[in-house]
Amino acid sequence: MFSDFKAKADLERTGYKIKEKDLSLPEHEQISDQTYDDIRTFVKLSYSHEETVKALILTPVIVYVINQLNGKYSILYEVYIEADDDLKGRCDIIVSKVEDDDTNDTLGDKPLLVTEAKKKTVEEALSQCGAELIALHKLGKKAQYGVISTGDDWMFLEIFPEQQIVYQHHRKLYLSDLRRVANIMLNVLKV
């Protein structure tokens, strides 16, 4: 189960490694000031429970980001995926572009994976998010990026399946970086 991936050593059992580096995260298109202000209104609300973080922080950011994009996107919650006996479980949120003939509950080809860190630190969810990215690749999806969030802290991951490496961005982002987080998500989904 994905929730069993708690340490880097757990992920290494899959043949992958987690390494840290300065990722070239896509940020060339900026979200509008109004969108940023709207997102910030949700962030000001207090939260402590996992479902509250999803409902009041993660979902509004995702919704505002996909509203900036042309195209049809789906936001799927608690998606069960199974690539093999070890790489299976529920992914918190998967966002993907949907083709015109698909329904909104279809997992597109290049999804963005969003993992809510349950232990209050993004570092504790690195292996879990990495395992979820690996599983998506094994299922033929071209998920390149994942993001882990507590609501306060954000960490981006990028998978390189040919090298069997999941890179974590060298720098954690915070609520004060919310505009940058939204810009990165916007550009990841735009690709």
Q: What is each model feature region?
A:
Residues 1-143, 156-191:
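A short, conserved, highly charged catalytic patch centered on acidic carboxylates
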Residues 148-150:
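Central hydrophobic cores of alpha-helical transmembrane segments
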